[in-house]
């Protein structure tokens, strides 16, 4: 059964690599929000030459190079700031794009599998004494929210409610928007259920 969403989108399911690359090449910035475990999607995006914004979480700092991605503090304002920074700085986007393509030429999918298998083998066959410390690949600090993004967020929170007929199309649309935003904030750990 295909996934359903409360907002307009087109679920492409699994698409061939060529189509995936074409899709990424229609974008200016790739956004991935891996909050608990590493994702392969930022690597796909870098391979396609797409600058990437990801969350600054421990599960990402060991895998992702700081020249190809911006790891943002996991709050909406910082994520928006990182996206805006890339969009407002074409030279940064170009540099990230070129780095990502070059980096991924030396990082085939098999390399990731080999590294994973070696790590599992080391864990099973040793007493952990001779395993070298793994250092984060991403050495920058988290990309923080700009003052502009924080002010915008504050203004949005102060905004007066819009009153509409509670039986109309606009009301139903606004209710759906509110549910979607609430679910996003809950999933990001910003709002409690």
Predicted regions and their residues:
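Conserved acidic donor-binding segment of nucleotide-sugar-dependent glycosyltransferases
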Residues: 66-76, 85-90
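Acidic donor-binding loop of glycosyltransferase active sites
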Residues: 22-37, 50
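Residue-level signal for the nucleotide or nucleotide-sugar donor/cofactor binding architecture
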Residues: 40, 74, 107
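C-terminal amphipathic helix plus adjacent low-complexity
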Residues: 92-193
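Conserved catalytic-core segment of nucleotide-activated headgroup transferases in glycan assembly
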Residues: 1-17
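Short alpha-helical segment that forms part of, or immediately flanks, the ligand-binding pocket
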Residues: 21, 40-47, 61
């Amino acid at each position: 059964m295909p996934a359903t969403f409360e907002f307009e989108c087109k679920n492409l399911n699994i698409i061939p690599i060529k189509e995936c690359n074409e899709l990424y090449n229609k974008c200016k910035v790739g956004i991935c929000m891996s909050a608990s475990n590493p994702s392969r999607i930022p690597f796909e995006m870098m391979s396609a030459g797409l600058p990437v914004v990801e969350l600054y979480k421990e599960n990402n700092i060991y895998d992702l190079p700081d020249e190809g991605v911006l790891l943002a503090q996991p709050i909406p304002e910082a994520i928006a700031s990182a996206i805006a920074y890339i969009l407002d700085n074409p030279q940064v986007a170009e540099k990230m794009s070129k780095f990502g393509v070059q980096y991924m030429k030396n990082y085939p999918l098999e390399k990731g599998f080999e590294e994973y298998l070696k790590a599992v083998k080391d864990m099973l066959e040793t007493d952990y004494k001779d395993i070298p410390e793994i250092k984060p690949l991403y050495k920058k600090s988290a990309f923080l929210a700009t003052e502009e993004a924080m002010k915008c967020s504050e203004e949005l929170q102060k905004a007066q409610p819009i009153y509409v007929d509670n039986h109309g199309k606009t009301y139903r649309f606004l209710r759906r928007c509110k549910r979607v935003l609430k679910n996003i904030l809950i999933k990001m750990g910003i709002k409690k259920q």
